[in-house]
Amino acid sequence: MTNFEELKWRGLIKDTAGEDIEEKINKGDITFYWGTDPTADSLHLGHYSSLVTAKRLAKMGNHPILLVGGATGLIGDPRPTAEREIISKEAVESNLEGIKKQVERLFDGNVEVVNNYDWIKNFNFIDFLRDVGKYINVNYMLDKDIIRRRLSTGITFAEFSYTLIQGYDFLHLYKNKNCIMQAAGSDQWGNITTGVDLIKKMTGEEAYAFTMPLVLDKYGRKFGKSEGNALWLDRNKTTSYEIYQYLINVDDELVIDYLKIFTFLSKEEIEVLDEENKNHPEMRNAHKILAREIITDLHGKEAYEEAVEISKSLFKGDIKKLNANEIETAFKGLTPYQITEEKNIVDLLTEADICKSKREAREFITNGSITLNGEKIENIDFLVNKNVAIEQKYVVIRRGKKKYYIIKF
């Protein structure tokens, strides 16, 4: 396959700009950019498809630039339905540094990170209108999907101007970095074409761009959302275990598509996994390899192996194999019930709201529905103290088959 054919096979090409873009990508040795606004101090799994595509283009012999929008982040990309909240300058600067470090680590330093505030700050309002606004027709902007959808509910001038700044970013990089191509998610097509058209009008030369389809789950939600919350790339915000659980449970019908998008496995390797997934879906080999490739890339091999071990221990109910740090990782979403002294199991189950009453607690114990650190408790006089806690700190209580509670000394 040619470079462009591989991108198409992996489902990474939706819209394109530039007549000979296929030839440019196949030839390689071009400078391209991908941009994001620093709306948080970490990127999330939804951004990861674009990052992997940028890494893929780099492996094809091209030169990546990541633009972090210190200027555009102060305004906010127009949403389809409502205005974004304005972020403070201090938050934008802090977020920008966090994202920069994250991206440089993912690319092993082989990426240039730029901040559009560095060149936008030098514009005064009149100069921007003369040098940029003069070349963009209002009717042209009104025809863009995101603008058109907001007209009925109202759109601020700041949001309306966002596409001008992003368009100028492409022009600036084109002139100063010989950056001839932009890659982005398909929701950015309107902003991308502004840049392509601006370059054409101001230089008479052609620029190139392509968009990637947004990665969705089977319900049409953006990939990387777990119960409405983003799965962050920063380990301190989202653990490797949380990402592992999300990936190991993705829909069978989508796992092969995700392998194409998010991994560097070859076509032949993915086709083998496709056959295995069709013939033996219960083995979940494709899911396991998807998790292995993503987590190893994001957090390292050791973090992936730890996530696997935590998952195995919980599945087998072998809680005692986990250490205190692994307990914290595995049950990050649970608020521990804290105690400072020895407690009778019946009293503890009631006080911690694990059971509604002492009578119910005794019933759960006698019918074998309560386990403590993986071991069934059948004695209503059992005492919970530091000696039974993992590292004298944590007690994991399971009620029934799936309901977990954490007790902390």
How does the language model describe each region?
Residues M1-Q188, T193-V196, M202-Y208, R221:
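NTP-dependent nucleotidyl-transfer catalytic core
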